Amino acid sequence: MEPIDDILFEVTDAFKTQKEDLLELVTLIDIYGEQVNQEGSYEEKTRFIETLNTLLEDNPSTTGEIGWDLPKGLLKFLSKDNVDVNGRLGTNMIVQGVMKCFYAISIQGEPKKCLITGLELLSSLCSKDFSKSDQQNKEDFVDKKANTLPPEGVIENSSNRKDFPSYGESKSSNEFFLKLKSYILFEFIGASLKRISTLFPSKYLGAAVSTIEKFVYSHADTFEDALFLLRRVYTFCRNYIPPDPPKDIQLNEDFTREMFDKVVEEESELQVRLLRRLCTFGISTPIKTVTTNADVKYYCALNQQKFELSAYYTEYLELFCRYYQMAFSLDVDIEGEFQNVIKECRIIYKSVPQEISAVNDEAKLVLERMVYKLAYTFEVQKAAKEKNVGLDYNGVILFSGIHYLETNQHLVKEMNITDAIYLYLRFTTPSLYSKVYYNVAVESVSRYWLWYAITTEPLEDVKKELKNLSVFVTKTLLHVLLQKNCIQVNQQLRMITFTLLTRLLCLIPEKVAFEFILDVLKTSPLPLAKTSVLCVFKDLSRRRISTKDNDSETDLIVEKLSKLKVNDSNKAQQSNIRHYIQLDSSKMKAVHDCCLQTIQDSFTADAKKSDILLLLTYLNIFIVLKKTWDEDLLKIVCSKIDSNLKSVEPDKLPKYKEIVDKNESLNDYFTGIK
């Protein structure tokens, strides 16, 4: 590399002498910049960036011509060779210098070209651009530390440090540099937009919104947390200022004052619509994997429990509320839009036929699959036909939940169970077909509305609606709730959703509830799902429901069901009671057949631990229900297990002793009643 003094002299001289040949000037800056970045020391790189910044500030006319062509080269200086991801950005003179250069370009450069450059660079950012592993990054950094590390304590960091976690806090250095570069580009794009003088600003804002949406969508799963993207979109929307119309517009008979005023009005409206769109998109997409806790808060309120958020969720809630307030400032009619979502959900599901329309089992299976895919098909078709700038309905749903989190009030006073079910299915089933539609945050708000519907609507109305609802819709709801809950890692959320599922099973017709349980036992690939419905089946078979169906008594039963408690002291004459599931020979035989299949699976060479646990669950249930269960069926189960136990070695079968003990318990019962 040439001496740095010579390089700086050449660049400085070029700004003075080559103003007529700007292409050569840009080429010179690019060549020397590349050379210094690859071969120079930290101090040499710092001097180059500082000199370039000074030249850009002192030569505004030249900056106006070439500024848009420099950002790509400047971003190359933001690399692991120049930036210690463990250090403070405020002490890194290269980072500070690059930011100053971007600022100089944003206020002096040709705004339209700068905007296009910023959007192109933001679109091209990808984590694969920083492909080395974290450990290799750290080792390479240590190797070059003597030449590249900045001197200690230069200036304080003026950036928002929350957006740039240290190496240990970040998922990877890839994420660190992706955040750093995108932060600079977001600011650059916003500053460029403000300076564009045009009668049609929506054209440029629309381009920015489109690029930002693509960037957010592409990286929503890349970042370790969603706070960075939430902040960037929020800051962009908050700081956007609609530019004034150009003052040099010539009004004449071809373009009158009335025409001018109409264009200004339409442009103003379109800009607001674009910001509304970005606001609803920006709140929903970054938090696809973050629950809002609206359902948790409502559940705690129902049970008079204290609702507490961790520091992690508190920070999210603060941003949620900022978005909520911003939506109001943009005149988003949250309640009206939410009602539009409900209407759309009705359109999707209102035509689902009743079970009686299915002539055979094959037709039933087709209809069940159809219900699963209805929302996904609708969403794909809607996206293909979408021509206008509309709100992101995921964001609208989130705002309905944030309204409750923020105000402790419900967005709508009345929500019937049918609409709540349609809403839940509309925003959860598409994710079963494409991860594009996966959104934990929206799902948590949808569950909140299910809770709200079954606890505020009169019980008789809820039961009537569920009875009249298509069985295919009801079963899809139950299956999706169970399936998603089985993969839920948060214990509290899993318990709350299981309680919701239990309550729904208490409210739907007994025939539908048992068919659902049996279907899970026969077909579900998830062992936890089978274990869960068996526990529910046990309690629904033992718990009494008043013949008058008193509200308070039903609530008490459901509460006990949710906790899966057993109380053998509740005895009553069979003629005076009815259970949620009345045991009869056909129901017992159906469950018995499922148990026999589990016995067969548990005593094979490739038996899984989940099969053994499921077998133990069956035995626990038979022990609890032994006095009401068919004795002959129980004896068959005991005999099958006895014969299989004799054919295996104790140390080869997990839980061998537990199986033996529980099976002996049943055998002892038969001995005692002889």
Swiss-Prot record:
GO terms for molecular function: DNA-binding transcription factor binding; protein-disulfide reductase activity. The keyword Cell division does not apply. It is found in: Cytoplasm. GO terms for biological process: cellular response to oxidative stress; protein-containing complex assembly. Its main location: cytoplasm. It comes from the Eukaryota. GO terms for cellular component: cytoplasm. InterPro entries: YAP-bd/ALF4/Glomulin, YBP1/2. Pfam families: Kinetochor_Ybp2. Keywords: Cytoplasm, Stress response. Interacts with YAP1. Forms a peroxide stress induced complex with YAP1 in the cytoplasm. Systematic proteome-wide 2-hybrid interaction studies suggest that YAP1, HYR1/GPX3, and YBP1 all interact with the nuclear pore complex subunit NUP116, which is involved in nucleocytoplasmic transport. Belongs to the YBP1 family. Involved in oxidative stress response and redox homeostasis. Required for hydrogen peroxide-induced oxidation and nuclear localization (activation) of YAP1. Functions probably in concert with HYP1/GPX3, the actual YAP1 modifying enzyme. YBP1 is not required for HYP1/GPX3-independent, diamide-induced oxidation of YAP1. Present with 3100 molecules/cell in log phase SD medium. This is YAP1-binding protein 1. It comes from Saccharomyces cerevisiae (strain ATCC 204508 / S288c) (Baker's yeast). The lineage of its organism: Eukaryota, Fungi, Dikarya, Ascomycota, Saccharomycotina.
